[in-house]
A protein has these predicted regions:
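Short, charged surface segments at domain edges that flank catalytic/cofactor-binding sites
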Residues: 4-7, 11-71
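Short Cys/His-centered divalent metal-binding micro-motifs
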Residues: 80-81, 109-131
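Domain-exit/linker segments immediately C-terminal to small folded modules
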Residues: 97, 130-140, 144
């Protein structure tokens, strides 16, 4: 029987693999080479073609996850490592670069849900954090 460390290590390896894929292929993932329009050679104006440097380690990801108590940086909800193996799960952890012009460095990343990371990626305003906090506060007060 595998010990707990062996079992959870696969989750960290998957998250690390996702970071490396994003640094090479962008958040949209790998593209096929069959059709130039689908291969990433011809991209929309808002899509970056530059690669991002990765200096973080699996150990860094674990440390940040524990510093955030396993919760999404933006939504403060629990993230599920198991959801890393669920295709398109909005609750799976995702590595979010705070400054999208910089690479994946310890001082430039937070762990968030795929849901929040995708939303933040589509919204370029610097007020994302305060707006999310206000939305969550209003949602809580409306439910009381």
């Amino acid at each position: 029987m595998k010990n707990k460390k062996d079992v959870t290590e696969k989750y960290w390896k998957r998250l690390w693999k996702n970071v490396n894929m994003s640094s090479i292929s962008g958040a949209a993932g790998m593209r096929t080479d069959n059709n130039p329009k689908l291969s990433g050679r011809l991209r929309k104006g808002n899509q970056s073609t530059k690669r991002h440097e990765v200096s973080i380690t699996i150990g860094d990801l674990k440390k940040i996850f524990h510093q955030q108590d396993g919760k999404c940086f933006w939504l403060n909800i629990p993230m599920s490592l198991e959801d890393l193996f669920v295709s398109h799960s909005p609750f799976a952890p995702s590595v979010d670069r705070i400054d999208n012009e910089r690479g994946y460095h310890k001082d430039n990343i937070v762990l968030t849900t795929r849901f929040a990371n995708k939303g933040r990626g589509a919204y370029m305003g610097e007020d994302f954090g305060p707006r999310i906090k206000k939305l969550l506060q209003e949602s809580i007060s409306d439910s009381e």
